[in-house]
Amino acid sequence: MNTVRVAFLLVFVLAVSLGQADKDENRMEMQEKTEQGKSYLDFAENLLLQKLEELEAKLLEEDSEESRNSRQKRCIGEGVPCDENDPRCCSGLVCLKPTLHGIWYKSYYCYKK
């Protein structure tokens, strides 16, 4: 029984003494890895920043090209009176003189083509 205790104690002492020596090496390895990780993170951050700046430039360029005059003006729906000289009927509609109802109004209305 004493031999088992002595053997166990010997293994325990060796493990502790060698483990502390490795502890310093592990600490140095961890410092190197964190420094490498920081440089990698800085590189990835710069790359992401460049991509975001390019995307922002494209979006601002598209906004500057679009003006208020390029928007579609409001249109007149089906069955609504329109002006013969300036028809503002929606797409797919035509400004025509009414055939049956509305003859007495003497006005033009938007109808489907």
Curated annotation (Swiss-Prot):
Q: What is known of its domains?
A: The presence of a 'disulfide through disulfide knot' structurally defines this protein as a knottin.
Q: Give the family per the record.
A: Belongs to the neurotoxin 14 (magi-1) family. 01 (HNTX-16) subfamily.
Any chance you could tell me the propeptide residue ranges? Answer: 22-74
One GO cellular component assignment for this chain's record is: extracellular region
Tissue specificity, in the record's words, reads: Expressed by the venom gland.
Location within or outside the cell = Secreted
Question: Any keyword 4Fe-4S?
Answer: no
Instruction: Tell me which positions the record assigns to the signal sequence.
Output: 1-21
Q: Could you tell me what this protein does?
A: Probable ion channel inhibitor.
Q: What is its main location?
A: secreted
Secreted keyword on record: yes
Region called Disordered, residue ranges: 61-83
Transmembrane intervals: none
Disulfide pairs here are: 75-90, 82-95, 89-110
> What keywords sit in the KW lines?
Disulfide bond, Ion channel impairing toxin, Knottin, Secreted, Signal, Toxin
Source organism per entry reads Cyriopagopus hainanus
Q: Give this protein's Gene Ontology molecular function annotations.
A: sodium channel inhibitor activity; toxin activity
Q: What is this protein called?
A: U11-theraphotoxin-Hhn1a
* Domain of life assignment: Eukaryota
